[in-house]
Amino acid sequence: MQALLPIEQYDSLLAEKQKKLTALLAPFHAPALAVFPSPVQHYRMRAEFRIWHDKGDFYHIMFDQRTRQRYRVDCFPMASQLINQMMDTLLPLLKTNRVLHHKLFQIDYLSTLSNKIIVSLLYHKTLDEEWEQAAKQLKASLLQQGFDLQLIGRASKQKICLEQEFVDEVLTVHGKSYVYRQVENSFTQPNAIVNQKMLEWAVDCTQNSEGDLLELYCGNGNFSIALAQNFRKVLATEIAKPSVAAAQFNIAENSIKNLQIIRMSAEEFTQAMNGVREFHRLKGIDLNAYECNTIFVDPPRAGLDEETVKLVQNYDRILYISCNPHTLCDNLQHLCQTHRIEKAALFDQFPYTEHMEAGVWLIRK
């Protein structure tokens, strides 16, 4: 079964999102939205499928979000062309080897614009030497067919990487290329084309900035790497170890000299800035050496907690990317007491869904 996309409805669906976000931001006197559309198909760079075993056959399935009924997926138009090519090639190879398909229950795909892909095979069994040998043969066969891939096996408390657990993406921001290491099973922006547009918008907002930038929740450095060119120094926080390691690689790979990553949560950083407690992880970093008058936040769906909102209000300029406009508006109730919205944007990261990615650029009143 092919999960068809209503491509002919794309423009009207995006217009509806624009209308909704405009209405949500209206109480805060936001200017007209800049709207950044997505490609209408092949826009998702990652996908996860359950595997359904049926009378000696097996295939990718997904579950209908409303009915929870499973349905077969032989191709997936919202995923990148590379993922579709891999889906088409991989399953026939798995079917020829019982060691590889026995108790296989899920396959995860992570692809890049740089034409690399990670395939993760998830099992309800312990992976042994026999599995590893079969997996090496599978990888060799896929390499022979022209795929640039990493193959990973996962089971309970077990992970086998045949080579490495990451791929290096290349994103272009206003004509300049940046390398981003993306680690399997870690967060990456799902829509790479729209991500590039988000980065360009953020760079444009912060052009001609003075002083330093603080970023909370930096992930693999997606934004801070591109924004570093606009600031004297950048200080960024992230809690997940794999993301911090990827960010450190990205800093070195892109020759960014003015960006420092520290591994702590936004809440912990707030405590450090307010002098509530000291952190060993900040040893050797002089927070007083930073003159951060701009802050960038890209929080989880829950938005910023109350203490972080207070921290953010201390900065003259606030760049806020949100994956949940409702919690963004909750935060704006407080932020707009001290700041005004200079620019606002809608990024269509998730076409054909109700999800909206929003950006606001706030300046102190």
Swiss-Prot record:
Q: Which UniProt keywords apply?
A: Methyltransferase, S-adenosyl-L-methionine, Transferase, tRNA processing
**What is this enzyme's EC?**
2.1.1.-, 2.1.1.35
Q: Which GO terms describe its molecular function?
A: rRNA binding; tRNA (uracil(54)-C5)-methyltransferase activity, S-adenosyl methionine-dependent; tRNA binding
Provide an example Pfam family for this protein: tRNA_U5-meth_tr
Enzyme class at the top of the EC tree: transferase
A single GO CC term, please?
cytosol
Tell me the residue numbers annotated for binding S-adenosyl-L-methionine: Q189, Y217, N222, E238, D298
Q: Which GO terms describe its biological process?
A: tRNA methylation
Q: Where is the active site?
A: C323 (nucleophile), E357 (proton acceptor)
Its biological purpose is as follows: Dual-specificity methyltransferase that catalyzes the formation of 5-methyluridine at position 54 (m5U54) in all tRNAs, and that of position 341 (m5U341) in tmRNA (transfer-mRNA).
In Swiss-Prot or TrEMBL terms, this protein is called tRNA/tmRNA (uracil-C(5))-methyltransferase
Q: Which organism is it from?
A: Pasteurella multocida (strain Pm70)
